[in-house]
A protein has these predicted regions:
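Hydrophobic alpha-helical transmembrane segments of membrane proteins
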Residues: 1-63, 81-216
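Alpha-helix N-cap/helix-start motif at helix boundaries, enriched for small hydrophobics
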Residues: 77-79
Length: 216
């Protein structure tokens, strides 16, 4: 599995201009105003996490995936590497952009509003992992290009359904915000982490099964 990580790290090195551009955009957003800190962290976290999906596209190019399967690498190890890569990129992206936000805003501003905003952005990590939980099995089964489009359609449907339910129930953004603020943050965080771990592991199991049935 180490070889798979080395391969994907080399792929990321080839895309270093892309990552530098994303980081620069994050710095600009952080400097734009206090309200942009959370957006910058969320943007960088999701964009970086998606690269785990992009590596599958590179693997499939010119029958590269079929060649990889002739090496001493099992299909389960291949899928495991993608899920570990996705989780690692997500955590690293959040950490890098959070540090960038602190540097851009100044350490002094950590007392109060900025620290609360950065802590609040921790929610982007499970959200990015849930996005990968849906997308990775689809990409593994249908291929990078088709799987990416299907995942986009699925997320659009999910968002539309949630939005419709909120409107049907007559809930306002303020009401939802007030309800969330009334919850125990520690319990909510623990619940979100547990739910994300269960879904991510379940997605990994599905991904392995799909990969084992895949023909090259």
């Amino acid at each position: 599995m180490k070889g798979l990580f080395v391969k994907d790290i080399e792929l990321m090195k080839q895309q270093k201009q892309y990552f530098i551009l994303v980081i620069v955009m994050g710095v600009i957003l952080n400097l734009a105003g206090s309200g942009s800190v959370s957006f910058a962290i969320g943007y960088f976290t999701f964009v970086t996490a998606i690269f785990a999906i992009t590596t599958i596209s590179y693997d499939e190019f010119d029958n590269g995936l079929a060649f990889l399967m002739t090496l001493p690498v099992t299909r389960k190890q291949y899928v495991a590497e993608k899920y570990l890569l996705g989780a690692g990129l997500t955590a690293a992206a959040w950490g890098i952009e959070a540090i960038t936000g602190v540097i851009c805003k100044g350490v002094a501003e950590l007392q109060g509003c900025l620290s609360e905003k950065i802590i609040g952005t921790l929610i982007y990590i499970p959200l990015a992992l849930l996005m990968l939980s849906v997308s990775l099995p689809l990409v593994i089964h249908f291929g990078a290009e088709k799987g990416r489009y299907i995942a986009m359609v699925m997320w659009a449907i999910i968002i539309a359904v949630v939005y419709a339910l909120i409107n049907t129930m007559g809930l306002s953004a303020d009401a939802v915000d007030a309800w969330l603020n009334g919850l125990n943050r520690g319990m909510v965080l623990a619940g979100v982490v547990l739910f994300t771990v269960i879904v991510y592991m379940g997605s990994f199991w599905i991904g392995v099964r799909l990969m084992e049935k895949k023909e090259f």
